């Protein structure tokens, strides 16, 4: 079975600039996702789609395929499904291969376990699904989970009046 893993990593984050290459536990954030994808052994191919040369260089060093994303698909308002579709179509042409499944892994989930990937894929295979999205229960309203950096200090950007 040919399963394509797409990893979409845009450079233009407003909240945490260059977050996808910031080091977390000694590695660039994107490296965690690439390593998880490789360790899962579910994917015949892994492709990183990005508009950032630094991100693409990291991906190349880690031995995965890369795709330079167009400026049009790198804007703030572009939906992720459009980017995944573009990566899948271009990967099929580039690798001369038809994929049975396309699985996208978010860069911003470094705590994801390989077992999470396995369990999600098993659920997808055993169900009658066209799509499967993972998530987790938030401890508080996600609106209040947003952070920002000001003068090299990380803080919650929205606060309630509760004490």
Region roles according to the model:
Residues 47, 53-102, 119:
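Short phosphate-binding loop-to-helix
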Residues 105:
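Catalytic metal- and UDP-sugar-binding loop of GT-A-like glycosyltransferases, i.e.
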Residues 30, 84, 113, 117:
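Aromatic/hydrophobic pocket-lining residues that form the small-molecule binding cavity
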Residues 2-49:
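N-terminal glycine-rich phosphate-binding loop and ensuing alpha1 helix
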Residues 110-163:
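Conserved core of the sugar-phosphate nucleotidyltransferase
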Residues 43, 97-99, 126-130:
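Short, high-confidence coil segments that cap the C-terminus of an alpha-helix
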Residues 10, 71, 136-137:
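Histidine-centered beta-alpha loop that forms part of the nucleotide-sugar donor binding/catalytic region
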